[in-house]
């Protein structure tokens, strides 16, 4: 899988999402639950806004000194016996991982949940050279078995119910029991444990890398990442270049913000800090590789969108977004969905495929208020719109013509008066009572789902003139 998860046009993807009543119900329920849990966890911590400000300061400081901390990380990982590779592009990252697998003559690779490995199409790259890649996160495993893309940053299978999951397991894996979550989890655990023992390589993502120790931090709910890091003889960790913290002190702050913002817990079930195995340690990989991925991030770092790199992938913005609630994650056409996806995806994937995403927002600002590191997401969405219109010249032709006509009419009293007199007659074929019930062209996007007020037959100036004279209108 790559960052792009669908070849459908944006409007078609949105239409599919709106018509999927189960998905909308599941998203609504999950958003409400996660939002409530997040508020409770924040209240328990106390001084939540001060913690947000501290998180923002840590992320901003790290980005301002990213070159220094990356070099420090590289030196410390190397001192501990690990190998570090800086990949400028996603192709370079995938090629390096392929080369490691070839060198090890690996046939089976087990991995934990990682957005950046999806971004670089790692699974596909390994499958090209004959490796079997197994997802160990339960949600990702369900999607892998069903060949279905993720719809949420932290809950990838959110759009499926347990009956659908049972049917997938029955059809693809020969599962014969009920749709009880415990029974299905037990079944998957048995499937995965057998594969863990046979895997030559384990691949993980990285929530945060600690510069001054050369350590990596992984946060999971299932403990699968611990097995991925400890059982296979070779471990490959893949991280976006921005996922840095200077020391363990900053890590402590950001992990607390991440867990509370993502799932409303003080800590998730497993927070693991690890790296290359040391002499005194009894388990862990014999060989460790860290792949640091740029893939456009250095350009973002030097742009007006820099603050998006503060993201800690908690999905708090997704969990409060009213647009995501109604259209779901697949509508974004990217592994990165919700407000953060609408900002980040066009920067990584370009406007040609993702120019609609910055407009998939009501600009209500709920995402900005929810972000634990205070990324001004709704402002960044507006900046995207400005770039699309002014720098790229990508405003739709119909919109350009409409704005040009409005500009001409609004700047001429005579044209404005003539237009206001003609409007009622021009719209009468589409009017029922005092509402526009159907539209043509761009108006259909509005009138197909809501009523539009019909133009008044009486101009305001005429009404005001009569009212001022004491008329009874």
Curated annotation (Swiss-Prot):
Instruction: Please give the InterPro entries that the UniProt record associates with this protein.
Output: 4Fe4S_Fe-S-bd (IPR017896), 4Fe4S_Fe_S_CS (IPR017900), FTHF_cligase-like_sf (IPR024185), Helical_ferredxn (IPR009051), LUD_dom (IPR003741), LutB (IPR022825), LutB/LldF (IPR004452), LutB_C (IPR024569)
Provide the residue positions that the database annotates as binding [4Fe-4S] cluster 2.
321, 364, 367
Q: Which GO terms describe its molecular function?
A: 4 iron, 4 sulfur cluster binding; L-lactate dehydrogenase activity; metal ion binding
Q: Which UniProt keywords apply?
A: 4Fe-4S, Electron transport, Iron, Iron-sulfur, Metal-binding, Repeat, Transport
Q: Which GO terms describe its biological process?
A: lactate catabolic process
UniProt xrefs under Pfam families = Fer4_8, LUD_dom, LutB_C
Keyword Repeat listed? The answer is yes
Q: Decide whether keyword Cell membrane is in the record.
A: no
The residues listed in the UniProt record as binding [4Fe-4S] cluster 1, with positions renumbered to this chain, are 311, 314, 317, 371
Q: Which residues form the 4Fe-4S ferredoxin-type domain?
A: 302-332, 351-380
Cross-referenced NCBIfam families: LutB/LldF family L-lactate oxidation iron-sulfur protein
PANTHER family, alphabetized:
LACTATE UTILIZATION PROTEIN B (PTHR47153:SF2)
Q: What does this protein do?
A: Is involved in L-lactate degradation and allows cells to grow with lactate as the sole carbon source. Has probably a role as an electron transporter during oxidation of L-lactate.
Please give the family membership noted in the entry: Belongs to the LutB/YkgF family.
Protein name (database record):
Lactate utilization protein B
Q: Which organism is it from?
A: Bacillus cereus (strain ATCC 14579 / DSM 31 / CCUG 7414 / JCM 2152 / NBRC 15305 / NCIMB 9373 / NCTC 2599 / NRRL B-3711)
What gene is this protein translated from? lutB
């Amino acid at each position: 899988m790559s960052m792009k998860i669908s070849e459908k046009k944006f409007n078609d993807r949105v239409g599919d999402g709106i018509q999927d009543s189960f998905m909308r119900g599941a998203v609504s329920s999950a958003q409400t639950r996660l939002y409530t849990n997040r508020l409770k966890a924040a209240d328990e911590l106390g001084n939540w806004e001060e913690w947000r400000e501290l998180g923002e300061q840590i992320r901003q400081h790290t980005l301002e000194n990213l070159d220094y901390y990356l070099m420090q990380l590289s030196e410390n990982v190397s001192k501990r016996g690990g190998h570090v590779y800086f990949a400028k592009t996603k192709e370079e990252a995938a090629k390096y991982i392929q080369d490691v697998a070839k060198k090890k003559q690996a046939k089976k690779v087990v991995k934990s949940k990682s957005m950046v490995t999806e971004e670089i199409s790692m699974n596909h790259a390994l499958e090209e050279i004959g490796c079997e890649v197994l997802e160990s996160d339960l949600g990702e495993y369900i999607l892998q078995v069903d060949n279905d893309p993720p719809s949420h940053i932290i809950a990838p299978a959110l759009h499926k119910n347990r009956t659908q999951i049972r049917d997938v397991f029955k059809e693809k894996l020969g599962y014969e029991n009920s749709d009880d979550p415990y029974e299905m989890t037990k079944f998957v655990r048995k499937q995965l444990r057998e594969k863990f023992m046979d895997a030559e390589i384990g691949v993980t993502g990285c929530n945060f890398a600690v510069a001054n120790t050369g350590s990596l931090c992984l946060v999971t709910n299932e403990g699968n990442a611990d097995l991925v890091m400890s059982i296979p003889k070779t471990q490959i960790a893949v991280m976006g270049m921005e996922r840095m913290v200077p020391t363990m002190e900053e890590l402590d702050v950001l992990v607390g913000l991440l867990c509370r913002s993502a799932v409303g817990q003080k800590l998730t079930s497993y927070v693991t800090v690890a790296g290359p195995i040391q002499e005194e340690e009894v388990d862990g990989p014999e060989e460790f590789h860290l792949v640091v991925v740029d893939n456009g991030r250095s350009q973002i770092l030097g742009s007006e969108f820099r603050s998006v790199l503060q993201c800690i992938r908690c999905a708090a913005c997704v969990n409060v977004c009213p647009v995501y609630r109604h259209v779901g994650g697949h509508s974004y056409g990217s592994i990165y969905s919700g407000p953060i996806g609408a900002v980040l995806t066009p920067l990584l994937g370009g406007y040609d495929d993702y120019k609609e995403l910055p407009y998939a927002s009501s600009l209500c600002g709920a995402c900005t208020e929810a972000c634990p590191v205070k990324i001004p997401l709704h402002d960044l969405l507006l900046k995207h719109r400005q770039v699309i219109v002014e720098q790229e010249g990508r405003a739709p032709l119909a919109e350009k013509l409409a704005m040009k006509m409005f500009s001409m009419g609004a700047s001429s009293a005579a044209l404005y008066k003539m237009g206001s007199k003609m409007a009622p007659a021009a719209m009468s074929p589409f009017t029922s009572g005092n509402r526009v019930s159907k539209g043509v062209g761009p108006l259909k996007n509005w009138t197909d789902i809501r009523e539009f007020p019909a133009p008044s037959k009486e101009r305001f100036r005429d009404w005001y003139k009569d009212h001022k004279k004491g008329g009874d209108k």
